[in-house]
Amino acid sequence: MRKVAIIGSGNIGTDLMIKVLRVSDLLEVAAMVGIDPDSDGLARARRLKVQTTHEGVEGLLALDEFDEIDIVFDATSAGAHIKNAETLRKFGKYLVDLTPAAIGPFVVPAVNLTDQLNRNVDNVNMVTCGGQATIPIVAAVSQVTPVAYAEIVASISSKSAGPGTRANIDEFTETTAQAIESVGGAARGKAIIILNPADPPVIMRDTVLCLTGDVDQDAVRDSVSTMVEEVSRYVPGYHLKQEVQFDRVSAADVRTLLPAGVGTVSTQISVFLEVEGAAHYLPAYAGNLDIMTSAALRVGEGIAERLNHAEAPRRSRA
């Protein structure tokens, strides 16, 4: 078991802690780190016999078990992660960043986890909730045909958006758009987030629009279906809301969306998704938070597998 610390005792950090405790055979929570001694996350961690500190990263460094920790999950904010990463850099820990800070490369497990692990980077970024839900679909379409433009709309329950999410709205759109291009493969990406105030709260819904040339529709459907199945391996509540749709478009109608130099655009591909949370700590409607913690858990386990594999020859020689 690889020991991990979680920085951030809010909704995301607490849900991630409970996921590790309940479902992971590779990871062990050694510490929960916060800055509010009265937070529900720290209180819950103490009840679960997890070591805690309310003194932030400095408190983490002071813990007796710090040297035994291999992986640190950061579920704070973009600004806080920059400081946390600088503090932790010299200690040789692997950082999994659940904020939009994007110091390290983007990781979407179903798309590029193996590639990033092979690069031996020590800080990876989980993009955003909308990115984790939609970039696999953009990548699936890109595997079949060049995507000139991809636009995603993430609609989440307002009740599931805590202070961290609200503080990072601008970073959400910028980071997600960048990852649509660099991970999803689109020539240009755009991201929109909607906080839905409906009560009772609705689950996360995502729309992915891709502009392409003429396409083999069956090949796109198969690629999207395969990708949805892959994501659902670590996010069970992830599924298509309806069949993939194809519409003819005029290049003149979409010319303002397209970057220079792309080929002929004739088709709009529309994919509609729902993400229901596992309700480990958060309500089932908070699929936007569940997909982040589920994806982060998958990345953490991937790092643990890599570390275990690297140590196996040394153990056998001993």
From Swiss-Prot:
Task: State if DNA-binding is listed as a keyword.
Answer: no
Q: What class of enzyme is it?
A: oxidoreductase
Q: Which UniProt keywords apply?
A: Aromatic hydrocarbons catabolism, NAD, Oxidoreductase
Please give a single GO biological process term from the UniProt record. Answer: catabolic process
The protein's Enzyme Commission number: 1.2.1.10
- Catalytic positions are 129 (acyl-thioester intermediate)
Q: Does the keyword rRNA-binding apply?
A: no
The record's listing under CDD domains reads: ALDH_C
InterPro entries found in the cross-reference section = Acetaldehyde_dehydrogenase, Acetylaldehyde_DH_C, NAD(P)-bd_dom_sf, Semialdehyde_DH_NAD-bd
Q: Give the binding site residues for NAD(+).
A: 9-12, 160-168, 288
- Listed as disulfide-bonded, the cysteine pairs are none
> One GO MF term, please?
NAD binding
Q: Which reaction(s) does the protein catalyse, per the Swiss-Prot or TrEMBL entry? A: acetaldehyde + NAD(+) + CoA = acetyl-CoA + NADH + H(+)
Member of which family?
Answer: Belongs to the acetaldehyde dehydrogenase family.
- UniProt xrefs under NCBIfam families: ac_ald_DH_ac, PRK08300.1
Protein's name in the database: Acetaldehyde dehydrogenase 2
At the highest ranks, the source species' classification is: Bacteria, Bacillati, Actinomycetota, Actinomycetes, Mycobacteriales
